[in-house]
Amino acid sequence: MEEEVAALVIDNGSGMCKAGFAGDDAPRAVFPSIVGRPRHHGIMIGMGQKDSYVGDEAQSKRGILTLRYPIEHGVVTNWDDMEKIWHHTFYNELRVAPEEHPVLLTEAPINPKSNREKMTQIVFETFNAPAFYVSIQAVLSLYASGRTTGIVLDSGDGVTHVVPIYEGFALPHAISRIDMAGRDLTNYLMKILAERGYSFSTTAEREIVRDIKEKLCYVALDFQQEIQTASQSSSLEKSYELPDGQVITIGNERFRAPEALFQPSVLGLESGGIHATTYNAIMKCDVDVRKDLYGNIVMSGGTTMYPGISDRMQKEITALAPSSMKVKIIAPPERKYSVWIGGSILASLSTFQQMWISKQEYDESGPSIVHRKCF
C-alpha cells in the first residue's frame, strides 16, 4: 500500500454516521443514519422527486417522508438502506472513490457474525475497496483517550455496552451489552411529555423530541431529591419553542428521561443500570486488573453527554466498589466522536498497515476472512 492514500474511517452509529479521513482529528461528515422515503407520490412532474433521501436531506424534508433507521441497537437490520448510507458517505459527503481507499468500519461488540460478513462483502463487492478492516467501537474510544487499559461505557443512540479492555484487548467474557440507549430515552421522553399533554407521534416529531432531549435533559445527582425540588418550585423548568412557534414548558421530564440509564426498569427493561452493569463487568474480570479498571472508567458516545452524568456515575460506582478503591471517571469533552477519533488514530498507525484485509485475500477466502483478521 502506498503511503499517500488516506484510509477512510466510518463510524456507523445507530443514530449518526461519522465519516472522514484517517489522520484527521475530527470527522469531516456527521449526519443522521436515516433513509427517508416519500409518503405520497409526487404530483408535480419535473420536481425531480427522488425515491429516497439520506441523512440531512432526509432530516430537512422529514415532513413529507417516512424516516427509517437501518441500524437498530447497533446491528444493521436493512442492508439496502445501509448501502444507500455508505453510497451517500463516499460520493456525497467525502466525495471520494471508495475503490481507491482502504475502509475502516466500526461495530458494536457481540454483534452477530453474519453482520460483519455482510459488511465485508458489501465493501469489497459493491464498493470495490482495496482493503478493509472492522473494529470494535469501545476499543477505539479507549485508544482515543490515550489508554490501552480501562473499562469503556459506550452509549450511543441504539446500544449501550460496557467493555473492559486490558493492554489493548477486550475481555470478551466480561463484556455487557444493554439494548437501551439514546433512542429509547427519546421514546421515553415522548411518553412522559404525552402525560403532560404534549403529543408527539410521527417519525418527524420524534426528531423534535430528540432535540429537546439533547438541549434540555440532564442527570440528577440525587433523583429523589431532584423530584422534590421540582415539585416545590419552578426553578428547574425550561421552555422550548417548537418549529411552529408554539412554546412548551418542561420540568421534571428534564432529568426523568435520562434517569432511565440508571433505572432501566422504568422502560420495562430487566437489566441493571449503567452503574451496576459497569460494576458487574469489573467484577467478572481478574482480581488483579480490577484496580486499573476502576481507575480508568472511560465514557464515550452521545448518550454520555448529559450534564451531571460523570458525577452521578462517580457517586454510584464509589458506593458499590470496595471503600479503599480509587474510582475515576474519564469523560473527554469530544466523547461524542471518540470512536471515530480512535479509528482515525488506528488506521494511521504504521504498525496497523499489515492488519488490513486486502481485496486479494477477500477474493481468495470470502467474507469469513473477517473473523480471522479482525478481532
Swiss-Prot record:
Localisation: Cytoplasm, Cytoskeleton
Recorded superkingdom: Eukaryota
Pfam families, per the entry: Actin
Catalytic activity line of the entry: ATP + H2O = ADP + phosphate + H(+)
UniProt KW Acetylation keyword: no
Aminoacyl-tRNA synthetase in keyword set: no
Bilayer-spanning residue ranges: none
GO MF terms held by the record: ATP binding; hydrolase activity
Enzyme class: hydrolase
GO terms under cellular component: cytoplasm; cytoskeleton
Enzyme Commission number(s) from the entry: 3.6.4.-
UniProt entry keywords in alphabetical sequence: ATP-binding, Cytoplasm, Cytoskeleton, Hydrolase, Nucleotide-binding
InterPro entries membership: Actin, Actin/actin-like_CS, Actin_CS, ATPase_NBD
Job description of the protein: Actins are highly conserved proteins that are involved in various types of cell motility and are ubiquitously expressed in all eukaryotic cells.
Family affiliation: Belongs to the actin family.
The protein's name in its UniProt record: Actin
Top-level taxonomy: Eukaryota, Fungi, Dikarya, Ascomycota, Pezizomycotina
